[in-house]
Every structure is written in structure tokens, then in C-alpha cells.
Amino acid sequence: MGRVRPRYIKSLGEKLLEMYPDKFTDNFEENKKAVAELADIPSKTVRNKVAGYITRLVKRRKAQEKAESAA
């Protein structure tokens, strides 16, 4: 079982993805750079966690869209 992310990571990731949906992909490295540009996060660790959460959300949405189109 995986680790639980803190609420502030989730809320920041969801907010950034909602505001800039075209800036994020399913590539962690690209998302890391985009988060650094868009949000003022002083900590590298927090930036990486937010980028990882956004990557996971994007992958989940793509899989969901693919499943809906196949059904």
C-alpha cells in the first residue's frame, strides 16, 4: 500500500491542474519544470511531490477517458 499525500499537496496540485491543464503531461520531468514556473514553492521536495501528484492525476484521467471511449 502506498503513502498518503498531505492535503496541501493535493489541493495545490489540483488547483494548478485546473488553472493550467495544457501545461501538464504524463511526464514527471516536464511537470516538475512547469510547477517550478507556475508556483512559488521554495522546497524541492514539495515541488517534486506536487509534480508527482499532478503526473498521477493526468495519467488517471487519460486511462479513464480511454476506458470510457472503449466502452
From Swiss-Prot:
InterPro entries the record matches: Ribosomal_eS17, Ribosomal_eS17_CS, Ribosomal_eS17_sf
Keyword Phosphoprotein: no
The keyword Repressor is annotated on this UniProt entry: no
One MF term in the entry's GO annotations: structural constituent of ribosome
Any single Gene Ontology cellular-component annotation: ribonucleoprotein complex
Superkingdom, taxonomy of origin: Archaea
Keywords, ordered alphabetically: Ribonucleoprotein, Ribosomal protein
Residue ranges the record marks as coiled coil: none
One GO term (biological process): translation
Recorded family membership: Belongs to the eukaryotic ribosomal protein eS17 family.
Name of the protein: Small ribosomal subunit protein eS17
Organism per entry: Pyrobaculum aerophilum (strain ATCC 51768 / DSM 7523 / JCM 9630 / CIP 104966 / NBRC 100827 / IM2)
Lineage, uppermost ranks: Archaea, Thermoproteota, Thermoprotei, Thermoproteales, Thermoproteaceae
